[in-house]
């Protein structure tokens, strides 16, 4: 339903829904006459997006995405609306990649491609038609900040290995880069949109000094194969002064739920 704050009138939107379908997200666009309404079937493997007119209540379908398994929840946060376009991420190519649509629902182009995943769309710079995003192109254990220009040239902006995230200014000219890795607590820098570090905001040097006084076990990455031949990543922490000739009790932790990657090159205790 929509509610007109001036007329005090409530209107029911004409959203096509399966008997067991539901609406997981409703988003404002930059057009007051287009309300983005996203629906899923109960199996959660078919997503439809409609633009609804709050006054007429008519809803027009502008996008459908389907999966053999399920639609990841992260797709919702990567839909960003601009005056003439919107972004969308999908696994329809086999990997999670970024797509660029017109507000009429026409696919303009697939922005990214390759055997890696786009983890987050950061934004679009209208001045030079550049896209900014985070992906795990280097390793499934790491994430870096990238830019793709109007000609499709890709540039890696983050310089430190590990897990990088970024928050851009409204005009897409600056961003805060937050990163850590297995041996480095969180560091936050202010960068321009070429990746140049303008200022270091957080170093966590005091924390590193404090930790140096203690014998803290370090994580070690390893890989193993499942019974059906799939390679998986893991990490282990051995006791301080570990001896391979001794036996130790083992605490094993494993969780395979969606959106829950546990093995990452990031700092934690």
What positions do the PLM features span?
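Beta-propeller folds
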Residues: 1-174, 180-186, 190-193, 216
